[in-house]
C-alpha cells in the first residue's frame, strides 16, 4: 500500500506525531507503514538478526541506535532477511551500509546516514522498550507511516482506505 504522509497529516493532524525530518530513504520501497516493534542497540546489530528472523508481516522494526553514524546497524544481509520474513520496513536512528543493494530490495528503509563500517554482532540491546528520538516517543504497538516526505506516528491504525 502507498502512503502519503502529507495527506495523512492533513486528515489526522490531531491524532499523529510528526517525526523531525532527520531521515533519508535507503530502501527500494519509498512508502511503507505498519505496527512498530522497538529495539534499542548501540553500534551492535546482533539482536536485530533474532528479531528479523520472525514473521514481520504488517510490522516495522524501529531501531534506536542512539543516533550513532559511526557503524551501520543495517546491511544488505539483514535487509534481505527482513524482506524474506515480510517486514514492511526498517527505521534506523543510526546508519546503514551497502546502500546500492538496499535500494534494490522491496522494503522501506529510513535511516540517518550511510557508512561502510559494520556494527558489532554481540547481541547487546533490548527490544519492546520505549524509545525517543526525532521529537517523538515510540512504543511497540504504535503505528508508523513513512514516505519520502517524512514519518508520522499514531497510537492507533489510521483509516487509510
Swiss-Prot record:
The keyword Cytoplasm applies. InterPro entries: RraA (IPR010203), RraA/RraA-like (IPR005493), RraA/RraA-like_sf (IPR036704), RraA_gpbac (IPR014339). One of its GO terms (biological process) is negative regulation of RNA catabolic process. Keywords: Cytoplasm. It comes from the Bacteria. GO terms for molecular function: endoribonuclease inhibitor activity; enzyme binding. Its main location: cytoplasm. Pfam families: RraA-like (PF03737). Coiled coil: none annotated. It is found in: Cytoplasm. GO terms for cellular component: cytosol. Belongs to the RraA family. Globally modulates RNA abundance by binding to RNase E (Rne) and regulating its endonucleolytic activity. Can modulate Rne action in a substrate-dependent manner by altering the composition of the degradosome. Modulates RNA-binding and helicase activities of the degradosome. HAMAP family: RraA. Homotrimer. Binds to both RNA-binding sites in the C-terminal region of Rne and to RhlB. PANTHER family: 4-HYDROXY-4-METHYL-2-OXOGLUTARATE ALDOLASE 3-RELATED (PTHR33254), REGULATOR OF RIBONUCLEASE ACTIVITY A (PTHR33254:SF29). This is Regulator of ribonuclease activity A. It comes from Klebsiella pneumoniae subsp. pneumoniae (strain ATCC 700721 / MGH 78578).
